Amino acid sequence: MPPAGDDESPAATGDGYSKKVLQGRYELGRVLGQGASSKVYRARDARTGAHVAVKAIRKQQQPHHHPSCRSPEAAAAARRCVEVEREVAALRRVRGHPHVVALLDVLATRSTVYLVLELASGGSVLSALDSRGGGHYDEPAARRLFAQLASAVAHAHSLGVFHRDIKPENLLLDERGDLRLTDFGLSAFADADQHLGATDGLAATHCGSPAYVAPEILLKRRYDASKADVWSCGVVLFVLTAGYLPFNDGNLMAMYRKICAAKFRCPKWCSQELRSLIGRMLDPEPDTRIKIGEIFDHPWLQQDGSSSSFGMIQAASSHSKPEVEKWEAELEQAMELNAFDIIGFASGCDLSGLIGPLPDRVRFVLPGGDSKSVLDKVEKLGREEGLVVRRKEEEWCGGVHVEATSGKFTAYVRVNLLPKKILMIEAERVIGSEIPKFWHQLQIGNLLVRK
C-alpha cells in the first residue's frame, strides 16, 4: 500500500491500478479528487474485481497537549478525527438508500483512515455543469436529479442525520447519471447533543460552504439543521437550472448580505412552478421555509418530466432503468403461463412460489379482475397514508409507484392484463424500514377487487 501520509498517487500498472494493495485487498488507481487533508482514489477490490472509491484521510497525530495549549495543527487534526467519525456514523445510519453513496469498508493505519465507498463513476454534478461550458440542465433533467436529492435528504432527516454541506461538489453521478449524496463529514445528529451542541434540537455549530449556507447560520443564530439543509437544496436547484449561483459577489460580506436578504433573480427560462419552488426553499425566514417533506407535493415536482412509459415514476424512484427492464422481463415470463396454468388458481392466489421466491415481492393472479379498480384502491390508500403516489396506465398494463416522504418506504404495484381477462398483479417493496398499512393489505390480497 502507499506509505502512510504519502501525498503522491501510487505507481500504477498498465491497467491503471497500483501493484501494491491496500491491506491485502484494494488496489489503488488514479486520484479522483482531493482536499486539504484527504484524497479519493479509484480502486479495485482484489477479491471480487469490483471497482470502488477509497477516501484516504490523514490523521496527522500530534503530541498531547493541554487543550488550551494546542497548536492550530493539532486542533485541525482533532477536527478531522471528529469529521471522520461523523461521516462513518452518518453513512452507517443512512445506508441502503439508492441516492446516498454506500460505505463498504473502513480501514486504518496509525496515520491514515481509509473509507471504502461505492464508486460513482460519473463524477460530480459540479463537473457535469462545468462540462456544459457554464450551462445548465433543462427542467426535466433537473427535476429528475433534484427529486433524487430530495429523497436522499428526506431519508437522512428521517433518521436524524443532517448533512449541513449540500453543494454540487458533494453530489456524485453514477454511470447511469443517477445521483449519490456524499461527504457527511460535517453532518449533525438529532439524538447526539455533542454533535448538535444543544439539547433543544437546534444546532450551534456554523459550517458549510459560504454560497450554500442559510441566512440563519450567517447571522450566528441557533438554527434547525433540517431547514438549513432545505436552503442548501434550494441553492443547488437554482444552480442546476440556471447554471450559476443565486447569490454571488467578489466581496464575501456583500455576498452574505445578499444571502440574508434573499436577493436573487431566476433566469427568464425558468417556469413559474420552478420559480415558486425555489422561492419557497430560499425563504430567509426558517419558520416559513418549505419543509423537506412538503417539497414532494409541490406542482413542479409533480410534473411528468419524461415521455417514457413510467416517466417520473422511474426518474424519482429507487429503480434504475436496468432494474425496471429486468422487472418487466420477469413479468413477460409470467405472461407466458398458459391459460390452464393460470385458471387453476383461485382468485388472489399468490404466485411468488411458482415464479420464484423474491424478497419483498408478492404476485397474485386475479381471474376476471378489473385493473382500474386495483390501481384506484392502491392510489387511494397510499394518499390516505400521506405517501407520494404516481400512477401510469396503458391499454394492457398499469402501475403505481408509492414513496414515503421520509424516504423509508418505496414500492411499486404493477397490473398486467393476461389472456382471458386475467390480471397478473405484482407488488414490490424496494425500501421498507417503515411498513405502511396498505403494504400489509397487499400481502394478504385485500386490494384485489373485482368489478
From Swiss-Prot:
One of its GO terms (biological process) is signal transduction. It is an enzyme of class 2 (transferase). The active site is at D165 (proton acceptor). Induction: By drought and salt stresses and abscisic acid (ABA). Belongs to the protein kinase superfamily. CAMK Ser/Thr protein kinase family. SNF1 subfamily. This is CBL-interacting protein kinase 22. Keywords: ATP-binding, Kinase, Manganese, Nucleotide-binding, Serine/threonine-protein kinase, Transferase. CIPK serine-threonine protein kinases interact with CBL proteins. Binding of a CBL protein to the regulatory NAF domain of CIPK protein lead to the activation of the kinase in a calcium-dependent manner. GO terms for molecular function: ATP binding; protein serine kinase activity; protein serine/threonine kinase activity. ATP binds at L32, G33, Q34, G35, A36, S37, S38, K39, V40, K55. Residues 26-301 form the Protein kinase domain. Its cofactor is Mn(2+). Residues 361-389 are annotated as: PPI.
